[in-house]
Amino acid sequence: IFHAVSAFNNAGFSTNSDNLVPFVSDAWLLLPLAGALIGGGLGFPVWAELVRLVRRDRHVVHRISITARMTLAATAVLLVSGTVFFGCMEWTGLLSSMSLGGKLLNSFFASASPRTAGFNAIDYGQAHPITLMGTDILMFIGGGSAGTAGGIKVTTACVLLAAMAAEFTGRETTTIGHRSLPRSVTRQALALSFAGVMVVTLGVVALRFFDPEFSGDQVSFEVLSAFATVGLSTGITASLSAPSQIVLCLIMYLGRVGPTTLVAALAAKSV
């Protein structure tokens, strides 16, 4: 029960000192937990729309909102791409001793967990540096805008990609799914993303200053995990100096409260 609630709320807490590493080959545990943390990361508004869609009157046309569609599509893309990426990078590394099913299972779990709960069934301290970089990206993006996951949110990432596409193709408006987005939405996405990049950059600089003995890959992983309130680690957290740990605490607070506060403030000003 504890792990199920921890997964759905994207807390990532485990009653085991080594998290889910002892259950690395237990599909009956990892798959339900992955489903719970993905479900919690989608957010209740998305689930409410899906329920209404299932229960809809056949004579009434019901459309899923653009936010729900972005959340579902981006989640699916990130899960698939993350699974393929992790499998390719660690097939002969962390996954080398596992069966084919175990490799696929842990690649999928390693794709789902970093954006939300932060459970780990493998030792990230032994992961390839490129694997850590890919996981950094997943953590920074996060989950649904109304979900329990952290990060800048998948909807923000979708808006940024749409804005880039509009700029590259010379279009005046940003469109997603044949719908034009207000300029204020694009500005909010840019502001939120830039604020996130600034917090992460300053955090990495601070930790490298206080603890220069750790590699940039390790430090970046710790900072992004804190910013996205994921909780994954390469194993250096306990060895960090007190100033670095204080910096991580501040980053956790900013990562959890900052994006929501910024978007709410910008939205209030536009009313």
Predicted regions and their residues:
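Membrane-proximal intracellular helices of multi-pass ion channels
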Residues: I1-V271
